[in-house]
Amino acid sequence: MRSQRFDCRALGGTVVWLAVAVLAVAARAADATEDPADFTAKFAIEWHGITAGYTTLELTRTAANAYTYKSRNMARGIFRLAFPDVISQTSTFTIVDGEVRPATYHADDGESDSDKAVTLRFDWQTRRVTGTAEKKPVDLPLESGTQDTLSVQIELMREVASGRSPKSFWLIDDDQIKEYKYTREGTETLDTPLGNLETVRYRSDRAGSDRVTRLWLASSLGYLPIRAERSLAGNVDFGLEIRELKRP
């Protein structure tokens, strides 16, 4: 069951890819240099046609160039028997000279004695990222542009909003830094509860992994996400769909 819990936390990483489009809407990001605005968004998690739970994403500006970004996953119905606790991720970051710089990152599955918790600290003066990941020590060199799994969404949003197609990002994933590649697969018209919408589809993956994430972003809605999928070995195991979006 604990491995299932960890997979569900990993799903949170899939969910936050949706945030790139939500942020674009929240910031009215015609200009990639414009700072993102606060928002709260709710997504349904679909598993083989069943709504297995919901994810809430919340971005809060805490200072002139500082932000806190949170993801909370909660199972519903019979799925709560397997995943009774809230699975959360929190990133704090700043935007300095047009660059997103993560400061701290924390993830846990809601259990006080969890061995799956991740806590990271980014020191941009010493150029090191330190902390613990699943009870293993982390001490890695911090190269320019390195992101955590939440802060990368803001950087990706700025790339897409500027009209550029991002090719890859370096992410710290637990106790390793990995390169994730991004591919613009084309455009597609989708029939949605909001009507027929033209979308841009992106694929995200990395070398050596059979996990693929796809996003459908509605350009006419400021890159609002209307569909996302996570696939393993070519089979879709989770889908996501936005339900609510609130802004101050």
Regions found by a protein language model. Give the residues of each.
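Acidic, serine/threonine-rich low-complexity disordered tracts
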Residues: 30-124, 159-248
